């Protein structure tokens, strides 16, 4: 009998019934499955839990942050412009309201760089959600990086 209040993370794919010993094994299996479906080769996660996937012009970083229990997908868009920042920030917030689906624009304060990001709990993450997040981050970045650079100038 399973304890419904067991706080242990669940690393399993609901669609296939496959279970995994840890989050990295699960995400590596999802990366391999994604690569096979896309007809390409992708590197598995490195020792730090990172790999990169190219989607159109977007380079999507896949980060397994096991200590925090999350999957973080990040794709660089452009540096924050030196001028017109209020208008730029408003544009990013407006786009993040609906145009980015499950992703959002974010800014890395240390690098002063704009990213498209998606963050999900690792426990209970199934392949379809992984694929959807990867596709969404790639699509949003690919769609908006050139538009925003043209509109606000790339530094």
Predicted region positions:
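Charge-rich, low-complexity N-terminal segments
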Residues: 1-61, 106
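A short local loop/turn or secondary-structure capping micro-motif enriched for an aromatic residue
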Residues: 69-70, 81-82, 123-126
């Amino acid at each position: 009998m399973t304890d419904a209040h067991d706080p242990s993370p669940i690393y399993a794919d609901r669609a296939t019934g496959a279970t995994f010993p840890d989050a990295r094994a699960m995400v590596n299996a999802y990366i391999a499955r994604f690569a096979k479906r896309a007809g390409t080769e992708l590197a598995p996660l490195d020792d730090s839990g990172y790999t990169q996937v190219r989607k159109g012009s977007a380079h999507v970083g896949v980060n397994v942050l096991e200590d925090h229990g999350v999957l973080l997908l990040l794709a660089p868009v452009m540096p924050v412009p030196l001028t017109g920042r209020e208008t730029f920030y408003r544009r990013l917030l407006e786009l993040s309201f609906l145009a980015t689906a499950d992703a959002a624009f974010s800014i890395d304060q240390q690098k002063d760089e704009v990213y498209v990001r998606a963050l999900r709990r690792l426990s209970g993450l199934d392949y379809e959600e992984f694929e959807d997040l990867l596709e969404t981050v790639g699509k949003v970045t690919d769609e908006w990086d050139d538009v925003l650079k043209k509109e606000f100038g790339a530094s």
